[in-house]
Amino acid sequence: MMSKSGRVAATAAAAGALLLAACSNPPLPPPASERSSPTAMVEAIRAAGAADKSVVQVAPLRDPAVDGFLDQAHAAENAGNYQDALDRIDAALKLSPDAPDILQFRAEVEILLRSYPAAEADARHSFMLGPKVGSLCASNWQTILEIAQAQDRGPDIATARAARDKCHKAGPVRM
């Protein structure tokens, strides 16, 4: 049997442990890199653009040299050479600096390079220059949404989600 002083000591020790546990900080959330991989983020962005079946879609006409740089950029990205892909995209942008689809592609590659501020800036710039409806619009806002989610920016998540949803423009009802 435990003596009275032993019970008091055990109770005090238990109370002290509870007090220390109550004062500890909650565990930190995992870093953004563990919550969402850049590859998964880009897949979600591209899926948002592909999923938008708006009545309005914009297809740019461009210099064949720009298409050559973009083909090289896609090949570099597929090979996992993200910096080389970014360099090719930058070369395309020198020839076509206000092309919103190229800016969006650069944003996606910047995500793969974990350059989130640059990616968000390019997605916003692409949106400002591009159509306000359709797949490119949806990709722009999905980019901003993915970055906001990765950085736990709650209010920005809701704003980006709502803006992305506004990109869809349904066609007229035909009877």
Predicted feature residues:
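TPR alpha-solenoid repeat register
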Residues: 102, 136, 140, 173-174
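Canonical positions in the second alpha-helix
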Residues: 91-92, 125-126, 164
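Alpha-helical segment of the N-proximal tetratricopeptide repeat
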Residues: 59-84, 173
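Bacterial Sec signal peptide processing site at the extreme N-terminus
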Residues: 17-41
